[in-house]
Amino acid sequence: MIGDKTQMMRAKRAITFTVVVAFGLSLFAAAPASAEKKPKVAKKSSQVTKGLAICKPTKAVGHKPMRLTAPIVKKPFVNRTITLITNCGEIQIEADGINAPLTVYSMNYLANKGFFDNSPCHRVTNQGIFVLQCGDPSGKGFGGPAYTAPDENLPEGSGNIYPAGSVAMANSGPNTNGSQFFIIYEDNSRLEAKYTLWGKVVKGLEIVKAVAAMGSDNSNPAGGGIPNQPISIEKAFSR
């Protein structure tokens, strides 16, 4: 499972997204992933330095998330391009505003409000599931805005339903999407079809793969952990 950790620790606070479509909102969290094999041993820092010359030192420090309330959603729903400027290079996400309209509206809103700026990506996994998880400014996997959004565009079928390059929302259960998301960098992920699929990486997937290849500190009980090669979102914007 890829998710956030806060939901179990805080009482839900209901808010309403006023739209043509209305939905319930609450505080959200990000709990880690489900059954994975024990991750590979993390690589030494010297290997990280040698392996990722593309990455600059990051000045991003985990901090308290902005307590943004839900945006007022207005049609039309459109596709967006969300750009993440990281210390390792630029990652562009083609956001599917047609099939995941409320999610994309929210991510567009958060990006342009500066919510993601200077936020460390807090988890990478390299066995069982293959993801880089970001979107919590605290860098701990507990943070999010003051609202959640419903699930949308859940994949159907089985097998490789989240192919490499897919971008999906982390959650702590049904309809608890907040700000945390993950980028799948390798096919054949063993993810269940319960994560809102809202975009695909069209530029910079090689950055995610390179960071993942450096391993993690294996600090997450569910698998993976903090990337050995730090990667942070220094600036995010949406068009």
PLM-predicted stretches and their roles:
Residues 2-3, 10-16, 20, 24, ...:
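Cyclophilin-like peptidyl-prolyl cis-trans isomerases
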